[in-house]
Each structure stands twice: as C-alpha cells, then as structure tokens.
C-alpha cells in the first residue's frame, strides 16, 4: 500500500565502526521510496534456467507478445453464483413496411429434393427497425439445481521455472506484436476416475423480491442470421377451378378474296310458279346461285311447262333479306339422273310473279342429260351486298333451285364440292323460303382457306365452362423482384409477469475487503462494438478467499423463453496489478450472522488491496457443465470511481500457504506501462512468527471520502476477425401452410364491331408445326389478397459439428481518443451449425424484432461455497469460435480456490434455455486448476431458475495501510485481457407481423389473335360444343 517490498533483493553490506573495530550489519530499514524513474529499454530475454526452489512471488513483468492459441481447456469448476432476476420482455418493435409482392412465376415441375446445398455467405444485415421500449423488470426466477460436475483432466506438466533475478527497471512499452499462429490441437487423453457424489445442501428460505430497475434506453436490434438452405420443392398443388371464358378476340382485317370455288352439282328444279302465258318451251337454264337451306317442306309436284310468252319487262329488285340462322349441315344427297333437254320454245312475256311456294325437300339429283340447245339469256338480277364470312361449314345436300330474286347476304360458306359440268345459262328464279335442315352429311373434302374477315360484333360472354382435366405442371418461373421494406407495425402488448417462484439456496457470505466506498459512476453511453481483440494475458493464480457467510435466498421465477443470441463480446483488457499489502495476523472466524433483508444496492466500493495467498480449501465436487448461454451484448462501461482514503489499520493476519501453481497462461500483446505514483515509506520486515489461530474480526473501518475519479484509457487495438466456419445443414422442413384466397377475376374486355367476311380461299397443304411464339407481357399486378394461415413452425434442427476456427488476424495500431457513440450491433458470428434437417418451405420473412436492452447490473454477490452436486459426464471439446468483438474492460476479480477434479457423470439431455437474467458484475476469477484432457461433450443440462442475489457481507477489518499517494494520471490502455464471463442473453423480440399473401390480380387485356397455325396431330381428348362451335379438349 505504501510501496513495494524489496527485502528479498540482495542488500549491500553496511559498515559501522565500533570501538575502533569494524563489523557488518544486515539490511537496515528501507527508506522512503523515491519517485519513479523513466522507463528503461526492455532487455533481451535470457536463456531458460534450471528449475530452482520457488521464490517469493515477483512483481508482474511486462506482458510479452501473444503466443499461439492453444487448444481449449476443460470447463472451469467455479461455484455457480445465483442468477439475477429476469426482466420483463421488451415491447416489440414496429415491424417493417410490407414489400410489394413480386410477380408470380410459372408453377415449376416438382423435382426430387436435391442434396442440401452449401450454405451461402451471410447476407447483409437488414435495416434496423425502430427499437421498442424495454419492458419492466420481471420477477426473479427460481434458482436451478446445481448439476453434476464435469471430470477434471490430468494436470499438464509445469514448465521449468528459472531462478528469480533482481527486478530490473521497467522499460518502455514496445509496439504491439503480431498475433501468433494457432497452435496444434491437443490430443484427447484418458478419462479420469469417477469420484463420489456429495450430499445435497439444504434449501434456503424465501427472500424478498428485488426492486425493479429503471428502464434503460432501447438496444440495437441484432443482425440477421445466416441464410438457411433452400427447402425442397413442395408437392404440386391441386388444379384450380377453370377460369371464366376470356373475352372474344378481335378479328383481323378483311383479307383478299380467295379464288372462286368449283361449281356445285345441279339440283332438281324447284316447284313451278303460277302459270304464265303460254310460251315456247325454254331450254334448261344454267344453275343459279345456291341459296341457304330453308325449312323442309313437302315436295311439290312439278307443274306443266308453260307456253313461251314474250319477254316481259324486268321486275324491280327484291328486298334484301336478312341472313338466315345457321342450320345444321344436311347430309349429302345422291346424284340423280339428268333428264333430256327440252326443245327451245319462243320466249313469251314474263308473267306476273306468283307467291313463293314452300321449298320442297331436296330431291336426289338426276343424271346429267344431253346438252340442250342454247336458250335465250335471262335477265340478270341486281347484285346484293357481300355478306360477312362465316366459319366454313360442311356441305349440305343441295336444295332445289328457286327463282332468282334480289341477291341476299351470303350465308355461311360451306366446303365446296367437286366441280360438276357447266350447265346452260337459265333464267333467274325467285328465292324460295328456307327449308328445314336435313340430316348432317358426311364431311366433304377440305375447302380453300378464306382470307381473314374484318372484326365481328362483340359476342355475349359465355357461361363458365366445365373444369377440364388438370394439365401437366408448368416449368418453374423466374423469381419476382424483391419487395420493398414494409411499414413498421404497432408495438405488441406487454407480456404477463411470471409467477413468483420458490427461493433458491442461500449463497455463502464472504468477507468484505477493506477500502472506502466510492459513489457509483453514471452509466456511460455504449460505444460501438469494435472488432475482436487478440487474446490477452493469462492471469496468475490469485489468493484463496475465505468462505463467506450465507446470504438470504432469492425467490425464483418461472423460466422464460429462450432469448436470442447476443453478439459475442471480446476479451476484456487485463487490469493493472494492485499494490501488495503487508501481511496481517490472522483473525478468528466471526460468528455467522443471520440472513438480512435484501437492501437496495449501494454504491460500488473501491478495489481493495490484494491480500496474501491463503491456503487452498478442500475441493468440492465440480458442478455440471451448464448449457452454453447465448452471449449477451456488452454493457456500457461506467466511469472509474474515486479512490477513497485508507481505513484504520487492523491486525495483520497470518500468511496463508501458497497454492499450487497453475499452468502458464498465454502471453498477450504488450501494452504500454502507465506511470507509477509516488511510493510511501515502507516499514521494516520483522521475522515471520508461527501461524496463530484466527483471531476475532476487528471493528469495521471508517469509511473515507471518495477520491477523484481517474480517466479511462483508450481502448486497445482490435483484432481481425477470422474466417467463418463451414456451414451447417438446413433445418427440418415445416408444415406447409394453406394457400391464400384467390383474387377477383378481371373484367372481360370489349369486343370490337364485326366487319363483313371475305370469301373462302383455297386451302393449302398442312405446313410444319410452327414454333411457339414468345410469351406475352405480364398483366398488371393484382390486388393483395387476404393473408394465408401461418403454417406450423418447423422443428429445430439437431446441433451440427463445429466449424474450424479461423486464425487470429493482425492487430491494428493502438488508437487514442474518446469513446465513440454507440453504434449498431455487428453481425452474428458463425456459431455451431445444426445437423441437416428437412428443408423448410420458404415463407414470407417476418420483421426482426429488436433485442431487449441490457438491464442495470445487479449488486455484486458474495462468493459462495463450492457445490456438492452429482458429477456430470465429460463433454467433448467445443469448437474454437470466431473471435468476437472486444468487450468492455471488466474489473479483475480475486482468484478463488483450486478445486479437485470431480468424477465423470452420465450425459444428460439438453434442456431448454432458461430465462434471460440481467447482466451481473464480473465475478472473481478462481485459481486455475491443473489442465485436464478434453472430455467428450455432454448434453447441456437444464438451466436453473435464478435466485435473488445475496446481500453484501459485513466489512472486514482493514489491514494496516500506508498513506495513500496522489493518484497518477491514467496510463494508456494495455492489451485486451481475458474473456469476461458470458452475459445473459437478451430477450427474444416478438415475431413480426406476417405479411399478407397477395391475391391474384385481374386478367390482363387479351393480346391480338395470331395467325392460324397448321393443324397438329390429334392428341386425343373429346369434342364438346359451345355457342354453336365445336371444340376439342
């Protein structure tokens, strides 16, 4: 406290004259320590000496460069402290905006599920949603039982220690060294023997619930996880109901007139009209234009031939008749015998036009007779307008030819029959009534293809057709564009507080160290998460603390849901070595006090002087290896407290026995050495007396006034993150959710007005099948439909093999500057991947909920006794994870006693994660035991419920202290220290609102009809009629 003890160094002899003689004395009392000189240069390391007797512990030397990282050691055997109370889950953050749904691709053919693909690189972190407010702190959970301790491995061989030389001047700090390459992994050794199980301790009484801490600022949301492997394609969906008939296509423009077809067969003459004046018998006229088939009438008798009259004047043109309804095609009639030609008579006058008689049924045509003499040409009737071209029908049986009237609109064009012989031109007859359609005849030969007619009038929309057979699944379409970020949803409701659980067992109550209590510093703002720093120095084993009295038991709460994995914190920097206090006499054990009520946490006290190393206590059985908790975020570092004045001097305690020396830790990067304050005067060392019994505890020291706060040094350099481990397999596939509702059907387009049809052209030979045209452009996006039902979550995949740790990167230079503002959390490092499960179906991703913020750190509990639970099984060595970001500098804890190796327990099943507790202060480090061989990894045990933290023990009697020197300025930060304890994971944010599944959009406008392709080969199916047309399915 007042300076260093240099009595172990060789002292020069002192001469003293006495009565003319001269004799030499031993070392005299040590004078006051002068101010510290400037640091000298670092000397070169000397050769390794032979192992000598263990000397007094020397002052810590400069930290050497970080060596290669060795294999992971066995799990520590520290006593499990009480877990803090669990906080209420935070209010969920607002979900992001829902993205625009991409275009639906074509349904692909279902392929066989492929092998799980290589896991892709982690995607870029998504945009952080607005953090939700942190909820109130929940009731403390019930403390879990201490599991069985893991086996202790065999102790490694200690390196030979050279003789301790005199302490040289402290040189100036050199530049940070480069990190060494990773060392080879050690081999597995034999498993140790199983030790006996100790008795279970009594259960503690129920304590009072703790007071809820204030609500802190919201934390940053966690980064997105790694992308999972794509799931196998699902089964093809059931074919949907057929859609409504699409709108009629727009007919193309009128094509050029085709070639004239062959002449039809000459039909039988129609019924005779009213008798005219007698004229000469005319010759048979040429066949007139074929009229449309009319309704069937009885066959009329042929009237007698009238006498030839004089040719009358041409009558007026008949009225234009409307197009008749299309009748079914009649059957082909048999060809009849053509009668002999009559003698030509004189042309008589045209008689009065009689009423049109009913058209008789078409008779069988007669055989063609001999050609008669040419008769006089008849009058040509006026030409009618050209009617629209209908679909080519099958030729019906020719009906009788009536008298030619005014030319009406052309009916449906039938297939032209074989060309018959040309007849003589005759007179134009009147147009008869349409007869009933005859039976459907056999199809005639193919006619010529006519030119495409103008657009027809809009047809009436047909009814919904019957569902056709399901076609083969289409090919998989291209993925649609990524949607934009959706709006943030409203925060969710506050969760229900958990029930009050039973209290956990009381922890042992430890003695308080001396030192004045300083005020608690304000919580600083959190700085940005830096990259992981290199491994720090491994600390020397500390002194064994005396067991403390038991504190009150905390009440237990129900375990909450497992929190999301936080960002792993880096290793904290090693703090400066405190001054070594003088050895005091051992006081007697104080009476054990009754547990007091839990008080509000007081301000943090200043760090006391380091005492002498006590004797190692009996080793209790090692506790079980707990389930590895998710690493929490690094909390903000508070400012340094003021150093208080020293308390009153107590009686010095007896010097404890030196504990077993642990294995040498790895060397970290050398940090610059801070200036040392002025030393106080050191008293002379007396001879060590025999160890007496422990005396009664002295009265508590007077609390001094807090000193001024020191400045915090700049953070150490950050290391480079190693490469991620190999990816794991995908998880199991979840159940497929039902399909969303179908969107509304689009409005049918309007058909343009129809134009007049063209004539039928000659039909060419069938061409080769044409190639498929390019797909039409996609229609507009449809309205969003109702959201589908959320499918059941997939089962969690099994834990996979660990990835190989990457090499530690080269550290950057040491930066000096004020702490920066808190930045967003970094991406999640590669963890242990699960075994490959069935691939889940890709669903709409929900918005990431923001992680809960870290609660205020609870007051530091006293160190408990070693547990005596059953021994757990040896676990397999875990993988070296990637180096996480550097955490805040934790206070260096006092080392605990060395525990003996416990027996190996059976592998327990992995239990569910316990509730998230608030982040506690960093505990005191225990003495490092002998290094054992890595055991097989056991299953994670059940995480117990947290108990209430025990109250602070009474302050012990302070040791003699010298006058406190002035506090020197804070030196630059040293290299990063060892990893701090894993923090409690943050609360899992609520799942985002699932976006609604978009509904099917309206149908796009129909494209223009393409040119008719050649008929393909028949593919089977069946014919059905619709609106008078025949279709093949």
UniProtKB/Swiss-Prot annotation:
Positions of the UniProt region annotated as Disordered: 1-1033
Other remarks on this protein: These protein fragments were extracted from ancient bone material. The displayed protein fragments were extracted from an ancient caudal vertebra bone collected in Ultima Esperanza, Chile and around 13045 years old. The tryptic peptides required multiple purification steps in order to eliminate contaminants and to increase the concentration of peptidic material.
Annotated function: Type I collagen is a member of group I collagen (fibrillar forming collagen).
Domain of life: Eukaryota
Name used for this protein in its record: Collagen alpha-2(I) chain
Tissue specificity field: Expressed in bone.
Compositional bias annotation for Basic and acidic residues: 655-664, 919-930
UniProt feature, compositional bias: Low complexity: 25-71, 154-175, 221-242, 286-296, 340-356, 391-410, 519-528, 540-550, 583-627, 634-654, 672-682, 703-712, 766-793, 801-811, 873-909
PTM: Prolines at the third position of the tripeptide repeating unit (G-X-Y) are hydroxylated in some or all of the chains.
Keywords: Calcium, Collagen, Extinct organism protein, Extracellular matrix, Hydroxylation, Repeat, Secreted
UniProt biased composition (Gly residues): 276-285, 318-327, 459-468, 551-560, 692-701, 749-758, 812-834
Subunit structure, interactors included: Trimers of one alpha 2(I) and two alpha 1(I) chains. Interacts (via C-terminus) with TMEM131 (via PapD-L domain); the interaction is direct and is involved in assembly and TRAPPIII ER-to-Golgi transport complex-dependent secretion of collagen.
Pfam families recorded: Collagen (PF01391)
GO CC aspect terms: collagen trimer; extracellular region
Cross-referenced InterPro entries: Collagen (IPR008160), Collagen_Structural_Proteins (IPR050938)
Keyword Translocase: no
Membership in a protein family: Belongs to the fibrillar collagen family.
Biased composition (Pro residues): 1003-1015
Cellular compartment(s): Secreted; Secreted, Extracellular space; Secreted, Extracellular space, Extracellular matrix
């Amino acid at each position: 406290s007042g300076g260093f003890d240099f009595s172990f160094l060789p002292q020069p002899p002192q001469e003293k004259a006495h009565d003319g003689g001269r004799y030499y004395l031993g070392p005299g009392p040590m004078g006051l320590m002068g101010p510290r000189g400037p640091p000298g240069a670092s000397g070169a390391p000397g050769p390794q000496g032979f192992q000598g007797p263990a000397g007094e512990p020397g002052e810590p030397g400069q930290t050497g460069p970080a060596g290669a990282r060795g294999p992971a050691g066995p799990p520590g055997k520290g006593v499990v402290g009480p877990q803090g109370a669990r906080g209420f889950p935070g209010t969920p953050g607002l979900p992001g905006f829902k993205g625009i749904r991409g275009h639906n691709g074509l349904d692909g053919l279902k392929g066989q599920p492929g092998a799980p693909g290589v896991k892709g690189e982690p995607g870029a972190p998504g945009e952080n949603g607005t953090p939700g407010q942190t909820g109130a702190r929940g009731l403390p959970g019930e403390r879990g039982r201490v599991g069985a301790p893991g086996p202790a491995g065999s102790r490694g061989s200690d390196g030979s220690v050279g003789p301790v030389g005199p302490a040289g001047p402290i040189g100036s700090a050199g530049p940070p060294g480069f990190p060494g390459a990773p060392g080879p992994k050690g081999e597995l050794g034999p498993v140790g023997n199983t030790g006996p199980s100790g008795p279970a301790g009594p259960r503690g009484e129920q304590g009072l619930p703790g007071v809820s801490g204030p609500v802190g600022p919201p934390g940053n949301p966690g980064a997105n996880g790694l992308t999972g492997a794509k799931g196998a394609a699902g089964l093809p969906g059931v074919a949907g109901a057929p859609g409504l008939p699409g709108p009629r296509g727009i007919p193309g423009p009128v094509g050029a007139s085709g070639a004239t077809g062959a002449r039809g067969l000459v039909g039988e003459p129609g019924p005779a009209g009213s008798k005219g004046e007698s004229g000469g018998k005319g010759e048979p006229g040429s066949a007139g234009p074929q009229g449309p088939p009319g309704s069937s009438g009885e066959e009329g008798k042929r009237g007698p031939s009238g006498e030839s009259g004089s040719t009358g004047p041409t009558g007026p043109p008949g009225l234009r008749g409307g197009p008749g309804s299309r009748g079914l095609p009649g059957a082909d009639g048999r060809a009849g015998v053509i009668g002999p030609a009559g003698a030509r008579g004189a042309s008589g006058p045209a008689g009065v036009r009689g009423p049109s008689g009913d058209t008789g049924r078409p008779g069988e045509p007669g055989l063609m007779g001999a050609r008669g003499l040419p008769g006089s040409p008849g009058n040509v009737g006026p030409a009618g307008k050209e009617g629209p071209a209908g679909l080519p029908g099958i030729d019906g049986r020719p009906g009788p030819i009536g008298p030619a009237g005014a030319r009406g609109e052309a009916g449906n064009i039938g297939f032209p029959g074989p060309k018959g012989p040309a007849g003589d031109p005759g007179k134009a007859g009147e147009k008869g009534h349409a007869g009933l359609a005859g039976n459907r005849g056999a199809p005639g030969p193919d006619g010529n293809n006519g030119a495409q007619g103008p657009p027809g009038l809009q047809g009436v929309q047909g009814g919904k057709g019957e569902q056709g057979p399901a076609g083969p699944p289409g090919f998989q379409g291209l993925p649609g564009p990524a949607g934009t970020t959706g709006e943030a949803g409203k925060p969710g409701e506050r969760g229900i507080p958990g029930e009050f659980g039973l209290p956990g067992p009381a922890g042992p109550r430890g003695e308080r160290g001396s030192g004045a209590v300083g005020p608690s510093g304000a919580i600083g703002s959190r700085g940005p998460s830096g990259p992981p720093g290199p491994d720090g120095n491994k600390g020397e084993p500390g002194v064994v603390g005396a067991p403390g009295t038991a504190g009150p038991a905390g009440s237990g709460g129900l375990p909450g849901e497992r929190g999301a994995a936080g960002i792993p914190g880096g290793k904290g920097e090693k703090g400066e070595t405190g001054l070594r206090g003088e050895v005091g006499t051992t006081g007697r054990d104080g009476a054990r006090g009754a547990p007091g009520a839990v008080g509000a946490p007081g301000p943090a006290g200043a760090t006391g002087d380091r005492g002498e190393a006590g004797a190692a206590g009996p080793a209790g059985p090692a506790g079980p290896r707990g389930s590895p908790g998710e690493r929490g975020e690094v909390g903000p570092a508070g400012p340094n407290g003021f150093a208080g004045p020293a308390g009153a001097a107590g009686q010095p305690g007896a010097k404890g026995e030196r504990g077993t020396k642990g294995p040498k830790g790895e060397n970290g990067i050398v940090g610059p050495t801070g200036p040392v304050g002025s030393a106080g005067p050191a008293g002379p060392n007396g001879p060590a007396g025999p160890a007496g019994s422990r005396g009664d505890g002295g009265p508590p020291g007077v609390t001094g006034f807090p000193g001024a706060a020191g400045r915090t040094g700049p953070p150490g350099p950050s290391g480079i993150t190693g490469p991620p481990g190999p990816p794991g397999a995908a998880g199991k596939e979840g159940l497929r959710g039902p399909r969303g509702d179908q969107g509304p059907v689009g409005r049918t387009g309007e058909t343009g007005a129809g134009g007049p049809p063209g004539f039928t052209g000659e039909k060419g030979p069938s061409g080769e099948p044409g190639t498929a045209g390019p797909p039409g452009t996609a229609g507009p996006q449809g309205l969003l439909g109702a959201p589908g039902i959320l499918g059941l979550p997939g089962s969690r995949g099994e834990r996979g093999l660990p990835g190989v740790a990457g090499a530690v990167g080269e550290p950057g230079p040491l930066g000096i500057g004020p702490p920066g503002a808190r930045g967003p959390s970094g991406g999640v490092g590669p963890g242990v991947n699960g075994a490959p499960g069935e691939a889940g179906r890709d669903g709409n991703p929900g918005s990431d909920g923001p992680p809960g913020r870290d609660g205020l750190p609870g007051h530091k509990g006293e160190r408990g006794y070693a547990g005596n639970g059953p021994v757990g099984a040896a676990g397999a060595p875990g993988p070296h994870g990637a180096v996480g970001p550097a955490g805040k500098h934790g206070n260096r804890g006092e080392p605990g006693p060395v525990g003996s190796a416990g027996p190996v327990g059976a592998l327990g099943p992995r239990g569910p994660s316990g509730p998230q507790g608030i982040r506690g202060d960093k505990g005191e480090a225990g003495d490092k035991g002998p290094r054992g061989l890595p055991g097989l990894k056991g299953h994670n045990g059940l995480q117990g419920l947290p108990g209430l933290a025990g109250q602070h023990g009474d302050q012990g009697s302070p040791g003699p202290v010298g006058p406190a020197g002035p506090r020197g300025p804070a030196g630059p930060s040293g290299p990063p220290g060892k990893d701090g304890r894993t923090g409690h994971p943050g609360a899992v944010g609520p799942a985002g609102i699932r976006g609604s599944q978009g509904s099917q959009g309206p149908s796009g406008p129909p494209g223009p009809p393409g040119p008719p392709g050649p008929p393909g080969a028949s593919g089977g199916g069946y014919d059905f009629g619709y609106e008078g047309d025949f279709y093949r399915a």
